[in-house]
Amino acid sequence: VNATTPNNTFERYAFLVKGSHKISDRVDGLEDWRKVSMKPIDLNFRIHTPGFRLWLEQGNFTCFSVRFTEEGVKIICPRNVDFSLPEVQRLVRNAIIRAMKKNAQEYLPPLLSALSEQYHLPFKRVKITGSKGRWGSCSGTGSINLSCYLMLLPPHLMDYVLLHELSHTKEMNHGPRFWELLDSMTGGRARALRAELRGFNTDF
């Protein structure tokens, strides 16, 4: 699977250094996944997954800028930036999350639609969020929310989360029929994939 990014250079961002019943799935421990202590971000930072590529470069600007290219997302940093400053770390992390969310908005909905069609599990709409507390959720009306942090997962775990949420369009709880449905789409590996997802760690 290749990342989908605009062919043209994205506009530059300057960052200042200053109803229905809802099933809320913490699909398998995103909060636990984020308990890993975050390492400082600097010019050596890279994200390279099948769906998302991002790196930092030094530039001659007086502010940070984010550019989308055919190769991925490039964050251009001021030449004399001090990465040890907490405000710089917050700024860069926010820029990365913003870029990741934009990429997720282009990447995840077509993938969800393809899986929906393949397994005959229609949904009403999909929304990409910046949620740090759950991978996804599905409402009783078939509206699905997906976290942009899914872009950091390997493809088989990304598919698992999407299939998990699509399963809720038919089975609104985590009872036996839910797991039978999810097993039917994952080769009987639903619980194994859940366990693998719970063990997924990242430095970011």
Predicted regions and their residues:
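Walker B catalytic acidic pair
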Residues: E165
